[in-house]
Amino acid sequence: MFHNTCGRKGRFARAMGMALAISVTLSGCSTVSDWFADEEELEIRRLKPIDAKFTPSVKWDRDIGDGVDHYFSRLRPVYAYENLYAADRHGSVVAMNPENGDVLWERDFAVFEGDGWWDSIARLWRSGASARIGGISVADRLLFVGTENGVVMALDYETGETKWEASVPGEVLAAPSADEGILVVNTGAGTLFGFDTRTGEQLWRHEGDTPPLTLRGISGPVAANGGALIGTPTGKLQVNLLESGILAWETVIATPTGATELERIVDLDTTPVLFGGTIYTVSYNGTLAAVELRSGRIIWKREYGSYRNLSIEGNSIFVVDNNSNIYALDRRNGVELWSQGSLKSRSVTAATPVGEHIVVGDNWGFVHWIEQETGQIVARVDVGGDDEDDAIYDAPLNVDGVVVTMTRNGVVAAISTL
């Protein structure tokens, strides 16, 4: 919830990592962090045995930069036009072949302030001021990049060439979304923007309310069906007209309660899920809802709280709550089908449907396969070395049945079950 351009400081970091790994092995400990873990944390880290039905394996991995470090981030790879795109928070943007991880092109948007001989040497392991990339998406043969510095860029999907750049007054902490030639960008300042995808011209903006205290993060927008769907930090789900930005409707999903600002947090920080004519969303303080797209009418509500994105496969909706409990519900009526609590407190990611399973990552770099029908964990693989620095911090990506993950340290891995 945090090395080639694909890793300038990697030469030094990996050398140190090898030395540490040797010392750890000799001492008989699994990781350095074990030395400092209390019994409660060790209990969380001890995974319960499973009856594995298959054995996933890492097909390839690639270090694409410095990752997201300890920062909260929803930066994750994107698959489009038969290419895999990934970025690190610091500024590296990379296009890869999804079959083998080979780099097709790369850009570095980190800011360098000096050009002296010492700066040239220092760049071997550091890469300037962070571009603070917050999210990437692909549409209209363009790769869109949003940053916490309030910059939105469009890159050519084949070459990485910058096509246009715009500024917004606020942090872009979630991937933009595009439809019908309009790019929708949400900001931490509560303002929603519409840009022309081809030219970068600002078409509209919509000002929203921001309470005194909110979560670190924002709802990712969804541009679809002539609307821009968004969750707000005030507990509302809203739809703006895509062409003009005018508010079509808004519906209260969660209401503030409690005496303190902390108790009154009601953020809808997840990206809404549009399935058929229904929007699904969930609030941090405990409201999962299905809402009619045309009218904003609430179809059903249930008490589940989360800041993780929802996912849907068939008639099931999958929820990972604030404590890393995993649930499957019938999306038509909100009836709970099963729950899985054995990964509790492991900072589990949102679930990604892959075939007959859902796949989640966790805070110690493990990836788990769970049967959609039963909720049983049937396979797992260690991608991060049981180390929090290599946590899987956001939902895995499904690329034609191959699971792609990214660790906090910036390692993109493709995992096969064949």
Curated annotation (Swiss-Prot):
Keywords: Cell outer membrane, Lipoprotein, Membrane, Palmitate, Signal
Subcellular location: Cell outer membrane
Coiled-coil features, chain-numbered ranges: none
Family matches, as InterPro entries: BamB, PQQ_b-propeller_rpt, PQQ_rpt_dom, Quinoprotein_ADH-like_sf, WD40/YVTN_repeat-like_dom_sf
Membrane topology listed for this record: Lipid-anchor
Lipidated residue numbers (N-palmitoyl cysteine): C29
Family that this chain belongs to: Belongs to the BamB family.
Complex formation: Part of the Bam complex.
Name of the protein: Outer membrane protein assembly factor BamB
Species per Swiss-Prot/TrEMBL record: Alteromonas naphthalenivorans
